[in-house]
Amino acid sequence: MADPYEFLMCIHDPEEDTLTRNFPIPATPLDQNTKDISLNLDRKTSLRIFRPPTEEFCVTTNKLLPIIIYFHGGGFVLFNADSTINHDFCQSIATHLPALVVSVDYRLAPENRLPAAYDDAVDALNWVKDQGLGKLNNSEVWLKEYGDFSKCFIMGCSSGGNIAYHASLRAIEMDLEPVIINGLILHSPFFGSLQRTESDLKVINDQDLPLAVRDVMWELALPLGSSRDHVYCNPNIANDGSSSGNMAGLIKRCLVIGFYGDPLIDRQIQLVKMLEEKGVKVETWIEQEGYHGVPCFDPKIRETLLGKIKYFI
């Protein structure tokens, strides 16, 4: 392809390391089943919380609901928690399971390169912990009254799957009690390396996620001067000081979702093997048909995916 920035409808200013985003991203306003909460004022991060629709919520409040801490996709550079594509997907999760979904509006690159998003993930985990401990003056009533802090899950899609993975590594070193992480859900997680895989080369000009666009996303997201063999991109590289070797101590179960039409599928299969070698019990749902992010666009596949997640939870 000619210009990956043209594909992304973005302009990068290398002097300021900022991105002008012209990509059309509609946002969805709040309704009675969603609310926005400030997470870190200094970092200008926030959370969008989803509950089941009112009529279903009234039925399910006789039992506590699982809490899903969710990280959206967008190559680390696009979208927010209120972006319609992410809002609708999280609302579907909250409705179908049912569950409380805490969607993290983390900082984007290149203005805030990795590990900024991982730091925001830690803030979100600590916020959920503080809710469980009742430490905050303005406790979030939905979590306080209806959330099951012993049944929490970390979930992410695409680059959000990468963030979810690294958040789980950091969680190993954290005292999260009373929060208990019951599992990790990685939906088409975004990883890479300098060495190309067969699926990388098979669909170089993939209509949804071309190779040149993936490379640019990593150039914008990774610390300056880093290659795609940085641990943030390539999980097979020696760990960055977090206890990835002890991952099974916290994350006993992991669901990896993928599609063979996704150019990232080889890396997702590699990730499954690595997690299994670390003692993590991994379940997979990998479909022959489908492309990167297809459940966000195809209602039928989304319904099937939600069924798999519900069974896992």
UniProtKB/Swiss-Prot annotation:
Instruction: Return the Gene3D superfamilies for the record.
Output: alpha/beta hydrolase (3.40.50.1820)
Report whether Hydrolase shows up as a keyword of the record: yes
Q: Where is this motif: Involved in the stabilization of the negatively charged intermediate by the formation of the oxyanion hole?
A: 72-74
Q: What class of enzyme is it?
A: hydrolase
Q: Which UniProt keywords apply?
A: Alkaloid metabolism, Hydrolase
* Paired cysteines (S-S): none
GO BP, sorted A to Z: alkaloid metabolic process
Any one GO molecular-function label of the UniProt entry = hydrolase activity
Task: State which pathway it belongs to.
Answer: Alkaloid biosynthesis
Q: Where is the active site?
A: S158, D262, H292
Q: What is its EC number?
A: 3.1.1.105
The record's section on InterPro entries has:
AB_hydrolase_3, AB_hydrolase_fold, Carboxylest/Gibb_receptor, Lipase_GDXG_HIS_AS
The reaction(s) annotated as catalysed by this protein in its Swiss-Prot or TrEMBL entry are: 3-O-acetylpapaveroxine + H2O = narcotine hemiacetal + acetate + H(+)
Give the protein family: Belongs to the 'GDXG' lipolytic enzyme family.
Function, as annotated, reads:
Carboxylesterase involved in the biosynthesis of the benzylisoquinoline alkaloid noscapine. Converts 3-O-acetylpapaveroxine to narcotine hemiacetal.
UniProt name for this protein: 3-O-acetylpapaveroxine carboxylesterase CXE2
**What organism does the record attribute this protein to?**
Papaver somniferum (Opium poppy)
